[in-house]
Amino acid sequence: MSSKIKTSGGIVIKEHKILFIRKNNRWDLPKGKLEKGINSRETAIIEISEETGLKAKHLSILKKLIPTYYHKKVDGVFIVKKTDWYLVEYNGSFDHPLVPDQSEGITDCRWFSFDELVLVLEESHERIRYLVEFFLNMPFYKKYKLKLKTY
């Protein structure tokens, strides 16, 4: 017997930083389950806002990324969790306080520079490392990085 769970989330970027959440003693990316009547893109924005305290009006989806899959067995039921990921730009201020959603077990939210990612990813799930490495190797990211260097 198996069960499927669909979730959606994002790599949130601003300037040369990525937003991570701390959950279960690991750095992770904000995400959550799709609810009836809400599509994957909307879910990503809602979950990022709920889990980090960032205002949804300051979040813009730039691009759909690759999905990740997670498999586990719970009480004899095989669960497959598919997460649709989006590249999301935050156009608000870094001064806006990050508010971890403690009801979801999130203990911290923090912006990390691209240079700090090696250490952050050591404390992340393999699927998160894979996704972030995919993003960093995208032609889109390389153009984005070059654009930022001109400021």
Q: Which role fits each region the language model picked out?
A:
Residues M1-P30, R41:
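N-terminal strand-loop-strand
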Residues V120-Y151:
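Charged phosphate-binding loop/patch that engages nucleotide di/tri-phosphates or the phosphate backbone
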